[in-house]
A protein has these predicted regions:
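Sec-dependent N-terminal signal peptides of Gram-positive bacterial secreted proteins and lipoproteins
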Residues: 1-13
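Extracytoplasmic
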Residues: 15-213
Length: 213
């Protein structure tokens, strides 16, 4: 994943809207979980998950999970310390300096309902254009998009646009510009404009983040 992480807060968010883009339902199947809470169904696409849970209550609470206060890690290269640029450094953050590995967090939900997740992170410098993660809640992926969480990096021109010997404008190469960033987790497929939603029952849960790229 190659990033430093300060926090993963879950919070309620206003109802999301679908964009005008067409939905891909080719992988969609829904099966009832017999003998269990009928609210839970097996989901394969975020679109179907949204249809089931978007009408649920949205508690006015925030659940904070500081990046450095993880429950356990597996594989990868993890440490806790200070990270950032001069004037923009943060203390006591999780430093995930590898593309592989996973980190687990325990958290408690006081009120059942729909939540959104927001990450505060600093991308480490790598050749990858984005950071890709997979998210599990209680050991399961709630929908396919959760296995393809994408965090952007900040890119800037290496130098100003210039004119070559033939009078043509030349756009310079892009380089990564390190900075702390905060973003709600979004639908990587672009079918939904607003943050991804997660239905959480009251009680204790485990959040697992795994490095993909």
């Amino acid at each position: 994943a190659a990033l430093s992480l300060t926090a993963v807060p879950f919070s309620a968010f206003a109802a999301a809207d679908k964009s005008a883009a067409a939905e891909d339902t080719s992988l969609l199947t829904v099966e009832s979980a017999e003998g269990e809470n009928p609210l839970y169904v097996e989901q394969h696409t975020y679109s179907d998950y949204y249809d089931v849970y978007s009408g649920s209550s949205r508690p006015d609470v925030e659940i904070m999970m500081p990046g450095a206060e993880y429950d356990s890690t597996e594989g990868g290269n993890f440490s806790v310390g200070s990270y950032g640029t001069e004037g923009d450094a943060k203390d006591n953050v999780l430093i995930w300096d590898s593309s592989e590995g996973k980190v687990n967090y325990k958290f408690t939900v006081a009120q059942s309902g729909v939540y959104c997740a927001k990450m505060s992170y600093f991308p480490l410098e790598t050749t990858a254009t984005t950071i890709e993660l997979s998210m599990l809640i209680d050991g399961e992926s709630p929908y396919d998009t959760a296995s393809r969480i994408t965090l952007n990096k900040r890119w800037v021109n290496e130098k100003d646009i210039y004119v070559d010997s033939r009078g043509n404008q030349v756009r310079p190469s892009q380089i990564q510009s390190g900075a702390w960033m905060s973003t709600y987790l979004q639908d990587v497929d672009g079918l939904f404009n607003d943050p991804l939603i997660f239905y959480l029952e009251a009680g204790t849960h485990t959040l697992t983040l795994s490095g993909v790229k």
